[in-house]
Swiss-Prot record:
The chain crosses the membrane at residues 32-52, 66-86. Keywords: Membrane, Transmembrane, Transmembrane helix. It is found in: Membrane. This is Putative uncharacterized protein YDL068W. GO terms for cellular component: membrane. Partially overlaps CBS1. It comes from the Eukaryota. It is a multi-pass membrane protein.
Length: 109
């Protein structure tokens, strides 16, 4: 069964995020933290479609990959800063969030 690209991305996000949010290992503050990370990730991807961050002189494929890498760099910095702000006691949440970011990058590229 085929689906539109946007619907596929949303279903991919839902199938990966909700099992982790229901996990008893991760606390409530971390659940909120992961939701904020994912909402920023989705809004970044939507914004990238509207306002591409392409440096001039690059091909379309290269510039698309560059934009995605730039966005994931900022999201990773955001994850680290939010982790420090929320004082998450263990590193598991950051590892989980970074794993999801890597999975998303493979899915999108």
């Amino acid at each position: 069964m085929s689906c539109s690209p946007n619907f596929c991305k949303v279903s991919f996000l839902v199938s990966n995020v909700f099992p982790v949010l229901k996990s008893p290992v991760i606390g409530t503050r971390t659940n909120i933290f992961l939701l904020v990370v994912y909402s920023s990730l989705v809004s970044s991807l939507v914004g990238m479609r509207s306002f591409p961050l392409y440096p001039s002189g690059l091909t379309s494929r290269t510039s698309h990959s560059f934009s995605i890498l730039l966005i994931f760099f900022f999201v990773t910095v955001f994850i680290v800063l939010m982790g420090i702000y929320l004082r998450i006691p263990d590193i598991r949440a950051t590892v989980v969030a970074n794993t999801f970011v890597l999975n998303m990058s493979r899915f999108i590229i």
